[in-house]
Amino acid sequence: RYGSDKPERRFGCEIVELTSHFADSGFGVFKRAVKDGGVVRAINAKGFAGISTGQIKRLEEVAKEAGAGGLAYIQVRGATKDTWRSPIVKFFSEEELASIEKDLNIEEGDLILFGCDTRATVCDVLGRLRLECAEMNNWLEGKEDELDFHWVVDFPLLGYDEEEGKWNAVHHPFTRPKAGQEELLADESKWGEIRAEAYDVVLNGNELGGGSVRIHEGDLQSKMFSVL
């Protein structure tokens, strides 16, 4: 929802899942991403359609720094779709446009920012764009004294390293899988689904601390080591 494991929740602009709409899209970039097992997601920066050229360039820089190939966006200049301004909107079908409009709750004046790649890359890209838009629009103005404490849980137990071609422990190799998921360690196709008994406490986008429940059984620890 926020593209970060230490989310800033004092403003909205949550990440929206759009992958299912673009499996057979006329926009090749999105279609290829879905075919390759990636995702297509977006955020709606409310009221930011009047963004300047300089600000667009800055958002593009942020996206590329996070691993994106570029910046795909739509400026919603008016109440009808013929007022949507974007280098990519001409490739979308009417059905795709209607789905985007509904899922993102698009209104006149909005700016839509897309991400398409692996899940991890898209989360990072849109998470950073979300924070950059907040800074550009002063979305936290008047909220400086708000204290949004929350727990972040259900972290993945394992993460796949594309460069090294192997699985690693996201937290550490002694972290316990969620109850009932221990047997999934025997099935490599399920490793990405396993959640960890780990948790962080976050305040206003800053991690204050965290921890985990450890593995105490020798056989379970051996299974974990065999994965790594």
Residue ranges and their predicted role:
Residues 1-228:
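Class II aminoacyl-tRNA synthetase catalytic cores and aaRS-like
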